[in-house]
């Protein structure tokens, strides 16, 4: 029987309206069912949703719809990470206020997301630039400040002298500002910091308990926190080379065992000793100034050419006062790590090795592989960086490097310099306190006041929020808040004198470090309602990109602890389960003149082996580039609206999850989308053509007979798809749904002439199929449900239960041994008893041949496992 094609253009808006009118996805905090919180990392409102967003949010939506059907009270909210530089850039370029630009974009993207049929609780929506949100963020800031978790100190920043602003490390390109092109300077500015280092040990040790996080993310966090055990060693300066008033240099090292391989010491350009040495050395002062134009990030320092300047200062070796080593100022040493000074052992470290070769410093082998000959072992082309045996190290020779570590530590702890131990054991962390000051307008104002008499004073909570002024201009470089005629001027809340508001705003990472908690009670007067947030957190399933594996997740873990310690909640970890999805990639297209073209501007010709691309407008051939992450710069983006217009949202959702495992990248192709749409139509045809025969039938599974060929694959798929969704194996779940449609195709062909038992089984199998596709293609599921006369909405119905007997395979294969050696197999009904198994085994040709007409001495049957015939 022919059926009309499924039309998503009419179907999808209709069901979206039905869900909205039923307020189906609005979550009640007082619902008594068990809770389940699923959250995708909220988007920045850049203006358009891209297909990568579609994949991310569809994954979360599948989980949310499935858990809802399983009887959970599901929280699945959406909001906007709305502060940040792009809005200010748009204000400058397009003469539009950041607020207007941001909220216009939010409106556009909200409508795009709604077209995808996501089961989101829009009643909880907020943007981080909403006054209601950043008001509560300011409350948290003050609570953290009063708890001692916030401090103000000078810090080195990237300063763009043209833009008159601080640049993030990513905005410094080859030492220049990304927009102005000006040489960036490193400046010392007073900055606000969250004391995340107070939690370093806890943040590190708790990683072991994050069982539902990817191991690669846990490893990245461990490395970022970077715990190391080492020795802080005080090196005495040679008196005849020391600047006035300086007698020693403290160095932190994780490899004190290599101390006899030291050939130089190096200090950071902003180390006090470097500044002191530069006072009478113009060349050194010039070198330090050059270093100020490098980026401040570890990555910038790692990739830059390693440069040093010999200060002329020398230090005495801790174990030999006659042995002195030069002190360099080096551009790769960080003041923020350890003591801002290192000793270089070129034979055991690649960076030190390169530096020593560049400046003609000795390379002394001090660790060699186990079994190597100390008389012949040399360091030539590269250092030896692994564990081994000590050599050229006096009293350490022959020890393992770990034994040498302990020996050096114990000896130097007993030695003294000016009455204090030469060395002490120390645990260091790579993790630095989190600088949250940004010299920009479009961010959450820091609620602090500067008074000449009282110093820094927090804004009283009853005077919050500190709102951003709307009447600002971006005609000149710098932060508009600094030059606002009235906003920054305020009375000191402590003494009443004239004072100044803090004009820095908060790093946007602050906004995203607690939004998941605010979603639990988004309209509360306090940042969170404690009993409510304790019930919902931690987030059961958090989904987002691997690019946020370190900073966002680490800052969120810190924030949850800080909120706990300031009385807002009672837990430490914000996210129980974490899933990092792959990217959506697409090939790129480039014209001869260098222009990037969108997929819509290109016509593809030829087969897979000889594909050629042509620009539609000109007819000229264009170069096909590699698969890359979709980006606006290379124009290899696909609009979800275009896909929805062509095929419908369900097709986009289905294809996004069907092509590859969710943790891997997926290649967007028009052919793939078309293939997904063909399946949509196939499933629709199967169900609607069966509808007349099953419309008024009561569903009932069949365990035997011809009807069992319908019920068994349906129940097996029901069990397997549920397990796959629980494991986030969406592509496997989709493959099983494909199989089920194939399995039902034959039995459904003659339903109009089938008996009642078969039609009852078909009705139940159809209902199962509809429920299976519902989390993935919710609009199609509702349309199919209506077509078979289903009551209410699929989105509000419970997940069916599978019949355990129907998911068992009827036949099992048992290995058959004769006298303990396998000779073959027996295929038999799973429910066969021992007598039936013995009888069937003795009828096997290879068993009869082995027995040669004699009866067996014994037949041993291990139920559903193995059979052993003892001849």
UniProtKB/Swiss-Prot annotation:
Principal location: cytoplasm
Catalyzed reactions: tRNA(Leu) + L-leucine + ATP = L-leucyl-tRNA(Leu) + AMP + diphosphate
Subcellular location: Cytoplasm
Keywords per UniProt: Aminoacyl-tRNA synthetase, ATP-binding, Cytoplasm, Ligase, Nucleotide-binding, Protein biosynthesis
A molecular function (GO) term: aminoacyl-tRNA deacylase activity
Residue ranges annotated as motif 'KMSKS' region: 629-633
Residues bound to ATP: 632
Enzyme superclass (EC): ligase
Iron-sulfur listed as a keyword: no
Keyword Cytoplasm annotated: yes
Record motif 'HIGH' region, residues: 43-53
Record-linked InterPro entries: aa-tRNA-synth_I_CS (IPR001412), aa-tRNA-synth_Ia (IPR002300), Leu-tRNA-ligase (IPR002302), Leu_tRNA-synth_edit (IPR025709), M/V/L/I-tRNA-synth_anticd-bd (IPR013155), Methionyl/Leucyl_tRNA_Synth (IPR015413), Rossmann-like_a/b/a_fold (IPR014729), tRNAsynth_Ia_anticodon-bd (IPR009080)
GO annotation terms (biological process): leucyl-tRNA aminoacylation
HAMAP family reported in the protein's UniProt record: Leu_tRNA_synth_B (MF_00049_B)
Family of this protein: Belongs to the class-I aminoacyl-tRNA synthetase family.
Name of the molecule in the record: Leucine--tRNA ligase
């Amino acid at each position: 029987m022919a059926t009309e094609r499924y039309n998503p253009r009419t179907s999808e808006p209709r069901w979206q309206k039905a869900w909205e009118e039923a307020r189906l996805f609005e979550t009640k905090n007082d619902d008594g069912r068990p809770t389940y919180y699923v959250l995708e990392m909220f988007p920045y409102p850049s203006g358009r949703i891209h297909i990568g967003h579609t994949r991310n949010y569809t994954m979360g939506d599948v989980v949310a719809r499935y858990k809802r059907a399983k009887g959970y009270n599901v929280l699945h909210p959406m909001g906007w990470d709305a502060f940040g530089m792009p809005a200010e850039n748009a204000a400058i370029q397009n003469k539009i206020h950041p607020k207007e630009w941001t909220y216009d974009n939010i409106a556009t993207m909200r409508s795009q997301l709604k077209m995808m049929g996501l089961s989101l609780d829009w009643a909880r929506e907020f943007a981080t630039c909403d006054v209601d949100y950043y008001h509560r963020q300011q409350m948290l800031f003050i609570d953290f400040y009063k708890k001692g978790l916030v401090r103000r100190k000078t810090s080195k920043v990237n300063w763009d002298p043209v833009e008159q602003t601080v640049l993030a490390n990513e905005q410094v390109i080859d030492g220049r500002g990304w927009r102005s092109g000006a040489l960036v300077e490193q400046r010392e500015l007073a900055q606000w910091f969250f004391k995340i280092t107070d939690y370093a040990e806890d943040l590190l040790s708790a990683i072991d308990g994050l069982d539902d996080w990817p191991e690669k993310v846990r490893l990245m966090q461990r490395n970022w926190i970077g715990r190391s055990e080492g020795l802080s060693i005080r090196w005495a300066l040679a008196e005849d080379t020391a600047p006035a008033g300086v007698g020693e240099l403290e160095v932190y090292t994780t490899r004190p065992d290599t101390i006899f391989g030291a050939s130089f010491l190096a200090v950071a350009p902003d180390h006090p000793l470097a500044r002191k040495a530069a006072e009478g050395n113009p060349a050194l002062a010039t070198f330090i100034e050059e270093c100020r134009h490098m980026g401040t990030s570890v990555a910038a320092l790692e990739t830059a050419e390693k440069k040093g300047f010999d200060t002329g200062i020398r230090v005495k070796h801790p174990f030999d006062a006659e042995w002195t080593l030069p002190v360099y100022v080096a551009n790769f040493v960080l003041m923020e790590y350890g003591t801002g000074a290192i000793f270089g052992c070129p034979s055991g470290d690649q960076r030190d090795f390169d530096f020593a070769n560049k400046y003609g410093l000795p390379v002394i082998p001090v660790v060699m592989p186990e079994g190597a000959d100390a008389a012949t072992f040399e360091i030539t082309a590269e250092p030896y960086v692994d564990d081994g045996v000590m050599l050229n190290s006096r009293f350490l020779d022959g020890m393992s490097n770990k034994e040498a570590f302990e020996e050096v530590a114990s000896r130097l702890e007993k030695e003294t310099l000016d009455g204090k131990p030469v060395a002490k054991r120390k645990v260091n962390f790579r993790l630095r306190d989190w600088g949250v000051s940004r010299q920009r307008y479009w961010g959450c104002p820091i609620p602090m006041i500067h008074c000449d008499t009282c110093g820094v004073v927090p804004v009283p909570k009853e005077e919050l929020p500190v709102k951003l002024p709307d009447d600002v201009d971006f005609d000149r470089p710098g932060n508009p808040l600094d030059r606002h005629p009235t906003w920054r001027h305020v009375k000191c809340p402590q003494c009443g004198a004239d004072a100044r508001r803090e004009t820095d705003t908060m790093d946007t990472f602050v906004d995203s470090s607690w939004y998941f908690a605010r979603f639990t009670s988004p309209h509360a007067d306090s940042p969170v309602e404690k009993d409510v947030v304790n019930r919902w957190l931690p987030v059961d399933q958090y989904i987002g990109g691997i690019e946020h594996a370190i900073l966002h997740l680490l800052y969120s873990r810190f924030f949850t602890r800080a909120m706990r310690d300031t009385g807002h909640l009672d837990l430490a970890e914000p996210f129980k389960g974490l899933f990092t999805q792959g990217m959506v990639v697409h090939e790129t297209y480039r014209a001869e003149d260098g222009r990037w073209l969108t997929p819509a501007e290109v016509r593809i010709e030829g087969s897979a082996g000889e594909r050629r691309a042509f620009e539609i407008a000109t007819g000229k051939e264009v170069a096909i580039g590699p698969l890359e992450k979709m980006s606006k710069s290379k124009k290899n983006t696909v609009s979800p609206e275009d896909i929805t217009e062509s095929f419908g949202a369900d097709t986009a959702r289905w294809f996004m999850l069907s092509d590859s495992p969710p943790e891997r990248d997926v290649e967007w192709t028009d052919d793939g989308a078309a293939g997904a749409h063909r399946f949509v139509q196939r499933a629709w045809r199967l169900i609607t053509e069966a509808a007349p025969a099953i419309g008024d039938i009561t569903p009932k599974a069949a365990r035997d007979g011809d009807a069992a060929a319908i019920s068994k694959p349906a129940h097996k798929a029901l069990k397997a798809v549920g397990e796959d969704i629980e494991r986030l194996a969406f592509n496997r779940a989709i493959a099983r749904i494909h199989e089920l449609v194939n399995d039902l195709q034959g039995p459904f062909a003659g339903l109009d002439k089938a008996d009642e038992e078969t039609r009852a089984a078909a009705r139940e199998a159809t209902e199962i199929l509809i429920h299976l596709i519902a989390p993935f293609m919710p609009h199609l599921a509702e349309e199919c449900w209506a077509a078979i006369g289903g009551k209410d909405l699929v989105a509000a119905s419970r997940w069916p239960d599978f019949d355990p007997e129907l998911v068992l395979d009827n036949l099992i294969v048992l290995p058959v041994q004769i006298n303990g050696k396998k000779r073959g197999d027996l295929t038999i009904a799973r429910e066969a008893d021992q007598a039936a198994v013995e009888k069937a085994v003795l009828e096997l040709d290879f068993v009869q041949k082995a027995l040669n007409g004699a009866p067996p001495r014994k037949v041993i049957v291990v139920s559903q496992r193995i059979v052993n015939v003892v001849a």
